[in-house]
Design a protein with these regions (language model features):
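Recurrent small/Gly-Pro-centered beta-turn motifs in extracellular repeat architectures
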Residues: 47-48, 85, 128, 173-176, ...
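Beta-strand-rich domains and repeat architectures in extracellular enzymes and scaffolds
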Residues: 29-50
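Repeated scaffold domains used in trafficking and secretory/extracellular systems
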Residues: 31-38, 69-77, 111-119, 156-164, ...
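Conserved Ser/Thr-centered positions that define the repeating blades of beta-propeller domains
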Residues: 55-56, 93, 135-136, 185-186, ...
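Entry beta-strands of beta-propeller and related beta-repeat scaffolds
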Residues: 42-44, 80-82, 123-125, 169-172, ...
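A short beta-strand motif characteristic of beta-propeller blades
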Residues: 60-65, 100-107, 143-153, 193-196, ...
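Loop/turn residues immediately N-terminal
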Residues: 49-52, 87-90, 130-133, 178-179, ...
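Bacterial N-terminal signal peptides that target proteins for export
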Residues: 1-19
């Protein structure tokens, strides 16, 4: 696969843009990119320091807004960006710079922290590291679901790092206490099933060992994709026996996004 360096592009972290047959790479200084989502004919990426960038399909920054708060994750809903902080405060951000706070902190005392936000249907789901899933339809009333408590004795406890949703499914991902990856899926956020992480390589059945750091939904291929440690992407289509693993980078992949056959990811 040919590799071409791209110069003089304004991005905020090490970024790779891929489409079938071509990989583009570039690098710049931190701050860390924590999330990437498709937006119209490009992407929107969020940095931990509060910067949000709208890009074209090639990942070139076009517009930006600084919300001046730490960002744990973003989601795009009805053309607006929903940015969630580690303490579960949510802001609505428009590309023209207009911002508004949808809710204030839902987490007190610093005992837990948010790792991501996702929308499915009319509901918004917010995931914490300890496995609390908050869901809301209006950002006024939140219903918490304690995954680790609910499934105690059935699933091993996990620490969660990513949430992603399509119109039909919600996925959460994290790591068990033994360091192995954990992925669960649900249709409504109240009943969860463990997702198989086995895949076939050279006729050998293996199981994912890398830890998930972020997750994206590839609507074109109808599959969820884990961004993992050691530079791997793990593809999870509707067929749970059709998973695949692909090595993309020399270091951990911090965030990944898909739009119309393009894949944009950042490395730590």
């Amino acid at each position: 696969m040919p590799v071409r360096p791209i110069n003089n592009l304004k991005l905020s972290a090490a970024v790779l843009l891929m489409w079938w047959g071509t990989v583009l790479s570039l690098s710049a200084a931190p701050p860390k990119v924590v999330d990437i989502k498709p937006y119209n004919d490009g992407f929107v990426e969020a940095c931990i320091d509060g910067m949000i960038y709208w890009t074209d399909i090639d990942g070139v920054h076009l517009d930006s807004v600084n919300i001046r708060t730490v960002i744990a994750g973003i989601e795009v809903a009805e053309g607006s960006v929903l940015a969630v902080s580690p303490d579960c405060s949510v802001m609505k951000v428009e590309r023209n710079g207009k911002t508004g706070r949808l809710c204030r902190s839902q987490i007190r005392g610093g005992s837990d922290k948010v790792t991501g936000i996702a929308c499915s249907g009319d509901r918004t789901y917010i995931l914490t590291e300890n496995g609390i899933i908050y869901n809301t339809v209006d950002f006024k009333t939140f219903t918490p679901f304690d995954f680790n408590l609910t499934y105690s004795g059935y699933y091993d406890p996990a620490r969660f790092s990513a949430i992603c949703a399509s119109a039909a499914s919600i996925f959460i991902a994290g790591t068990y206490d033994n360091g192995m990856p954990a992925v669960f899926t649900s249709t409504a956020g109240n009943i969860w099933s463990e997702r198989s992480l086995t895949y076939t390589d050279r006729a050998e059945t293996l199981s994912l060992e890398q830890q998930p750091l972020s997750m994206a939904y590839d609507s074109r291929m109808d599959r969820f994709v884990l961004a993992c440690t050691d530079g791997y992407l793990f593809y999870m289509p509707g067929c749970s026996h059709c998973n695949s693993l692909e090595h993309k980078a020399l270091s951990d992949i911090a965030a990944v996004g898909f739009n119309d056959g393009r894949c944009l990811w950042t490395v730590e």
